């Protein structure tokens, strides 16, 4: 592994991403596939690029990412969180800008569990008057 490599772990919903950053040309590899191949949806690609665009480093860093668990939006959010943490390790002066954009905070929202006696998490069984 390279000496000048920076690491960040990101999580969102049930997804976890490991992000490795090193100086390069803006190449992004996710699970051995390119960003365009891995995320067909443009919104997911946009979410992944948000922290890099904010600090204007889209073509200065190479990213190697492994992500597992969850779906498309959860994985994209986990990658964004991981990239943010790796960028802060790379340069601590980026933290205020990333914090102001809201990328540093882990999004704690996740699926609410189903309760006994209910049909879903909050959906009550149909009420019959007679």
Swiss-Prot record:
Superkingdom of source: Bacteria
Keyword Chaperone (UniProt): no
UniProt keyword annotation of Ribosomal protein present: yes
GO biological process, one term: translation
A Pfam family recorded for this sequence: Ribosomal_S9
Molecular function GO labels: RNA binding; structural constituent of ribosome
InterPro entries per record: Ribosomal_Su5_D2-typ_SF, Ribosomal_uS9, Ribosomal_uS9_bac/plastid, Ribosomal_uS9_CS, Ribsml_uS5_D2-typ_fold_subgr
Keywords: Ribonucleoprotein, Ribosomal protein
Any one annotated GO CC term: cytosolic small ribosomal subunit
Protein family according to the UniProt entry: Belongs to the universal ribosomal protein uS9 family.
Stated name of the protein: Small ribosomal subunit protein uS9
Lineage, opening ranks: Bacteria, Pseudomonadati, Pseudomonadota, Gammaproteobacteria, Vibrionales
